Each structure stands twice: as C-alpha cells, then as structure tokens.
C-alpha cells in the first residue's frame, strides 16, 4: 500500500474497479494510478465506461453520497472503440473529472458512479487515498469552537451560553446565524479547484460572471508552475483565509480578546476537519436532542413560520424524512463522536435545560476555560435574560415543556419508525427507545 511520504501532497492507496455487468460492457479509471499523484491538492480522475443498451447520462464523483463532480461521458476514446468494435458509443466513452481534495478529509474514499438516462445508478470504481494536511497557524490566534449539530437541537441556546464566557465570542446568535469560518473555508475549497486555479491561463469568457471558478482544466505544459499553483499557492491562500477569520473575530472580541470563536456546523460538512488542520487548538462540541422531540420541533417551527426548512416539507412523508434526512445526519454525528480527530465533546439539550450550571461547567472545564461557580452562574443568568423575549424561536411555552413532547405530539406510527430507524443511535447518545 502506498504511503504519504515527505513532500507528497496526495497519494492514491487503492483503486477498485467494478467491471462489466448486465448494464455496462465495462469501465476503468486510467488516471490517477495507485501511488503518489502529481504534487497538487487537485485531483484529476480520467477513465471510461461503456453502456450495453441504456445511454449514460453522466458520471458522478461522490464522497459520502454527496456529489463533488458530475461530468458527461463524451470524451474521445479510440482505444475503447478498437476494443469494442461495432458497439455504439464506444468511440466517445471517456470522462474527465477534477476536484479539490480540500473538499475531503485528509483520509478519504471516493465512489465513481454512472447514471443511466432511465435513472439507474451503477458504481464504476472506488478510490481510497490521503492528502497532506494544510499548514496550521501558530496557535496564538483565536481558535474555532465548532458546534456540530442538527437544526432544532438547541444550538442557538448553546451558542449564547458559550459566548457568555469572557473567553468566547460569537456574533449575535439570536439575531444572525453567522457562518464566517464556513464562508472563508468554502472560498478556499472553491479556489483550490483545478478548474479555478487554471482558469487565468485559458479563460473561457471574461464577460461571464464568475469565470474564475469554472474555467479551463487543461494542462499548462509547465509542470513546475502547475505544481506550484496546486500546492504552494493553495497553502498561501489557506493562510489568507485563516487570517480573514481571525481578523473578523479579533475585531468582534475587542481589546479584551478571546480564546475561542463559536459557530455552528452541520454533520455532512468537511469544514470542521479543514479548520482542525488550519487551527491547532480547534475544538468540537456535538450537541444532540432526543430525535423525536427534534422532529416535533421541526414540524412546529415550520408551521409557525409558514415555510419549509430543515429538509422537511409540510404534508410530506414523515417516515421518509426520518429515514432519508434524519438518519444519515445523525449517523454522521455518531461517526464524529467516535472519531479522535477533534476530540469531540458530547452535550445534550436536556442537560442544558434541566441542569444548565453543571452542564456548562463541565463543558468549560473540558475546553480549559475558567469554570468557577460564579462565572457559570453569571453566564446562565445572562443567557436567560437575553433569551427571555425570543418567543419567535420557541415552539413550546418554555424549554422544559419541550422535553419529551413527542409522547403527545408525535403520531404513534411515526414514533415507531423513529424507534426502528434511529433506535441504536438513540441509545448511543444516551436516550431510551420506545
């Protein structure tokens, strides 16, 4: 198995090809090969796939079922035409996809999947690899406190409690749901795409908006220049994006300063892993709430506002929502909790509501922050004062009434679906099933 040696940016450790099936004559990944890839955070995947009868719509490059690239199958492949004489489409059965590996954690697994025009999806290949971690700052700067959670779990309450500590800063959590670090991390990820950093050398149309994001993906003919653009230049850009995050929160904290800034993140995002590379002192907190109460809150909050959010549609299939929206997100949270990368700390909404002082003191202590009784009591008191008038954010008369509401609000058949689909996850996070 290939290893990530000093100076190597990216290595492919294993490639699995699915080969022929009832639907396709075959397929392959020609590039990259197993072993060290060209010295760049950009990854180019080139190959071919040939359908037997049903035409191919496109090839998808997926990470954890989320598409990173969707490309047509139309590149000239005279070699495949020669190997499959008389087979329609063999001469143009090639595909080419480019992605930034900064949209992946340092160790990753990609799935290549083809979609036929009738909607059938078939795996083509699986790639496992690793990339170099981004250079980190010195650690003296303000560090991210990453709250990883799902909507209607009490995240705004927790952000307010955390930012009541003198060493933690957040931007007006009950007014704006600020995502400053996500913004700059996304800027970094998008500009680290080969289609972006190669765009200045073959711009398709300078009059087209955002041409710098999806320009050319051809080769420059200057290997060293292309290597620098895809590695050293990306690391310089990473430092710039990190500096922008730090500058915003340093300005927000004022002359007193702060050790942490706190923002929310979603389970599917790679951003917490990326920030953990950029910041040596990054910490992660996972917030959960009884999933059944959370579902009740999502439904009630959407009805209260009169529009759909959190992936839930009024009048939709609640069982399908539990299976296809809630389960994947909660499973990802569980995966993060088991991981060791950011040493995540688990906190439950119910503990914040029923015993905020001990829950908050334990969290502050875990973060290495002052956690004396007076400071914690003042943080809880300040939060209660700030949230007293936030009725528009609530769906019950008070937070205590929101605990266990599912016993009355959730139809029995949906509660049973939650038990069936989410039972092991409920137990893992410390909740009892039916």
Predicted regions and their residues:
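PAPS-dependent sulfotransferases, especially Golgi type II membrane carbohydrate sulfotransferases
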Residues: 1-17, 112, 133-146, 299-303, ...
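Conserved catalytic segments around the Walker B and adjacent sensor/switch elements
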Residues: 169-172, 345
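Basic, ligand-binding patches in group-transfer machinery
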Residues: 2-136
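ATP-binding Walker
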Residues: 152-153
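PAPS-dependent sulfation machinery
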Residues: 173-261, 305-313
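A conserved segment at the C-terminal end of the G1
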Residues: 156-168
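The Walker A (P-loop) glycine that initiates the GxxxxGKT/S ATP-binding motif of P-loop NTPases
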Residues: 149
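PAPS-dependent sulfotransferase catalytic domain
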Residues: 227-230, 236, 241, 249-375, ...
């Amino acid at each position: 198995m290939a290893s990530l040696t000093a100076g190597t940016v990216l290595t492919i450790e294993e490639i699995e090809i699915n080969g022929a099936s009832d639907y396709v004559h075959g397929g392959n990944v020609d590039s990259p090969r197993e072993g060290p890839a060209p010295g760049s955070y950009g990854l180019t995947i080139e190959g071919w796939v040939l359908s037997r009868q049903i035409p191919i719509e496109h090839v998808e490059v997926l990470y954890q079922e989320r598409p990173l690239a969707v490309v047509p199958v139309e590149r000239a492949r005279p070699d495949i035409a020669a190997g499959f004489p008389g087979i329609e489409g063999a001469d143009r059965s090639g595909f080419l996809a480019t992605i930034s590996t900064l949209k992946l954690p340092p160790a990753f697994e990609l799935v290549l999947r083809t979609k036929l025009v009738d909607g059938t999806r078939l795996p083509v290949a699986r790639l496992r690899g690793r990339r170099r971690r981004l250079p980190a700052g010195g650690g003296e700067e303000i560090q991210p406190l990453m709250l990883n959670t799902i909507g209607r779990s009490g995240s705004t309450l927790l952000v307010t409690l955390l930012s009541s500590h003198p060493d933690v800063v957040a931007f007006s959590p009950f007014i704006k749901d600020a995502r400053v670090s996500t913004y700059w991390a996304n800027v970094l990820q998008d500009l680290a795409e080969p289609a972006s950093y190669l765009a200045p050398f073959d711009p398709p149309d300078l009059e087209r908006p955002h041409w710098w994001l999806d320009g050319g993906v051809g080769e420059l003919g200057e290997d060293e220049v292309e290597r620098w653009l895809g590695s050293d230049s990306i690391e310089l850009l990473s430092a710039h994006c990190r500096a922008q995050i730090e500058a915003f929160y340093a300005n927000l904290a004022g002359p007193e300063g702060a050790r942490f800034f706190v923002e929310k993140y979603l389970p599917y995002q790679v951003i917490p892993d990326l920030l953990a590379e950029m910041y040596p002192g990054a910490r992660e907190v996972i917030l959960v709430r009884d999933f059944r109460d959370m579902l009740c809150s999502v439904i009630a909050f959407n009805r209260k506002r009169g529009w759909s959010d959190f992936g839930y549609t009024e009048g939709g299939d609640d069982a399908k929502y539990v299976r296809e929206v809630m389960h994947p997100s909660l499973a990802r949270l569980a995966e993060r909790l088991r991981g060791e990368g950011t040493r995540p700390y688990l906190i439950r909404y119910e503990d914040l509501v029923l015993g905020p002082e001990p829950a908050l003191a334990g969290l502050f202590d875990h973060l290495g922050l002052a956690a004396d009784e007076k400071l914690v009591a003042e943080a809880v008191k300040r939060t209660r004062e700030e949230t007293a008038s936030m009725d528009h954010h609530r769906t019950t008369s008070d937070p205590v009434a929101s605990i266990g509401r599912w016993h009355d609000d959730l139809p029995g058949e949906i509660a049973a679906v939650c038990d069936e689909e989410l039972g092991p996850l409920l137990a893992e996070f410390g909740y009892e099933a039916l």
